[in-house]
Amino acid sequence: MIDIPGTPGTLTGLVLRISQCVFAAGSISYMVTSGGFFSFTAFCYLIAAMGLQVIWSFGLAILDTFALVRKKTLLSPVLVSLFVVGDWVTSTLSLAGASSSAGITVLYFGDLGSCSFEAECWKYQLSVALAFLCWITIAVSSLTTLWLLASA
């Protein structure tokens, strides 16, 4: 396997995992602190998808930290295959949650003008923006691990 920046067990891989955790946790926190998120199914789905992303990314960040401290490699084909599948699943779920929440945000709060609380609208929009940033970092990780698996 070739050395690609962002692969599991490297510092750039750890930075990607930590940024995924931070963006997903930020998205959850802004959505949960807004008042009526539970009345929109897309927002509830976004929280579920971002919650799964936090768990997945935090677990892999711990694994990356362990590999860096112990100077171990995480490039066995079985592990890389697991990373590819997990990253692609969480990437798909995160993109679906972010896109559906963005659609609801634009429809209800932009087109219909039914946002009477400005602070709540900003929280929804910020949560969706953080979800898309999370998805971008997941996409980078998943493409990196797929490229790594294909080069084996």
Curated annotation (Swiss-Prot):
Topology Extracellular: residue spans: 64-77, 149-152
Principal subcellular localisation of the protein: membrane
Any one GO CC term of the record: plasma membrane
Transmembrane segments: 22-42, 43-63, 78-98, 128-148
The keyword Cell membrane is assigned to this record: yes
Pfam families registered for this protein in UniProt: CASP_dom (PF04535)
UniProt xrefs under InterPro entries: CASP_dom, CASPL-5
Topology class, membrane: Multi-pass membrane protein
Organs and tissues of expression: Expressed in the stele of the root and in leaves.
Positions on the Cytoplasmic side per record topology: 1-21, 99-127
Localisation per UniProt entry: Cell membrane
The keyword Nucleus is annotated on this UniProt entry: no
The entry's keywords: Cell membrane, Membrane, Transmembrane, Transmembrane helix
Family: Belongs to the Casparian strip membrane proteins (CASP) family.
Assembly with partners or alone: Homodimer and heterodimers.
The name this protein goes by in its record: CASP-like protein 5B3
